[in-house]
Amino acid sequence: MREFCTKWWKRIATVDMLFIGVLTLLASLFASWLKQFPGFSLFGALIIALLIGMIIQFPIRSAYVGSNDGRKAGVKDAAGLISNKLLRLGIILLGFKLNLAVLFTQGIKCLPIAAVVVTLTIIVCYAIARKLGVDPMLAILTAGGTGICGAAAVMGLAGSIKVPEDKQDEKDNDVTMAVAIVAIMGTVFALLEIALGPLTGMTKDQLGITAGASLHEIAHAVAGGDAFGAVDIATIMKLSRVLMLVFAAIIIAIWWEKKHSEVQSTGKKTVAFPWFMLGFIGASIIGTFVPFVTSITPQLVDFAYIVLGMAMAALGINVNFKAIASKGKKPMLASFLTSILLMCFAAGVAMLFF
C-alpha cells in the first residue's frame, strides 16, 4: 500500500501536473461560462472544453515544452491522467442529474423506447462503420456517442474498454474523434429537426419525444425540445437514454474483452468491468431519495460538468490532428447515416405512442 501511494504521489506531485491541472480547470470554467451565450449553448460545455484543449496544445508545445523531452513526457502523462481519472469521477457525479423517481413515473413510457433506440442505434452504427472499414474501437465509440448521450457516452464507454499501454494514444485519439463526430452530427440534426419540426404536423409532445430520442447531446435535446415548447418531455426522454449508458457500458466491456481485447492476460480471464458505473447509479439513487442531496443537486451537476470539462480539455491537449484527419471521414459518414435512420425511427415511435 505504501509503495502504491508513493508511486502515485510521484506521478501527481509534479510541476507538469500542476500546470496542466490549472490549465484544464481554467478551460473547463471558461467553457461553462461560454455555453450561456447563443450559439455556444447548442454545443454544450464539454465540446467547448475539448475545442479549447485542442487550441491551447499549440502554445503549450511552443512556449512550455519546447525541445525539452522530459517536459513533453510530463505534459503527456499529466493530460492522460486527468482525462482518464476525472472522466470516471465526472461520470459518477453526473448520476446526480438522473432523477430515478421522475424517470420511473413521468418517463415510464420513455424507458422501453430508450432501450430499443440505444440498442438499435449502436448495432446499426457499428455495423455501418465496420462495413466502411472503421476500426472496432472508433466504430463502437462513435456508435455509443450517436446512440446514447454524445460526449459523455463516448467517455463512459472508453472508460470500460482496456487497451495495451502502447495503444493508449491511439485510443485517446479515437475518443477525441468520436466526441467531435457526435458533436457535429448532433448540432446538424438539432438544427434540422428544429427547422423541419413545424412542417411535419406533429404535436409538440411528439416533437419533444423525437428530439429526446434522436439528438446526441443533452444540450441538443434540450435545445430541440425548447424550440417546440416541449423541453420537459424532451429532457425526460433524453435522460432515459442516459440511463442506458450503464447497461451499454457493462455489455460493451464484456463484448470487447471477448472479441477485441489485446491486453495480455495473466492467468485467470477477467473483464474490464466499469465499476465507476456503479457509482453513477449510486449517485442517481442518492440524488433522488436523500433530501439534503436533492437540494444541492444543481451544484453537484455543475461540478460534474467542470470535472468532465477538465477531462475533455486534457483530451484536446493530447490530440493528434494528423490521425484524426486520416481516419475521420468514414466514422462521420456512419454516424450521419445512422442519425438519419434514428431521426425517422424516433419520429415514427413518437407518433405511434404519444
From Swiss-Prot:
Cellular component per GO, a single term: plasma membrane
- Regions crossing the membrane: 12-33, 43-65, 86-108, 112-129, 138-160, 175-197, 239-256, 271-293, 300-321, 331-353
Membrane found in the keyword field: yes
Supply the alphabetized keyword list. Cell membrane, Membrane, Transmembrane, Transmembrane helix
One Pfam family hit? Cons_hypoth698
Q: Where in the cell is it found?
A: Cell membrane
Keyword Transmembrane helix annotated: yes
Specify the protein's topology with respect to the membrane.
Multi-pass membrane protein
Where is it predominantly found? Answer: membrane
Which InterPro entries does the entry link to?
UPF0324_pro
Top-level lineage group: Bacteria
The entry sums up its family as follows: Belongs to the UPF0324 family.
Please name the PANTHER family in this protein's record. Answer: INNER MEMBRANE PROTEIN YEIH-RELATED, UPF0324 INNER MEMBRANE PROTEIN YEIH
Q: What is this protein called?
A: UPF0324 membrane protein BL1094
**Origin organism of this chain?**
Bifidobacterium longum (strain NCC 2705)
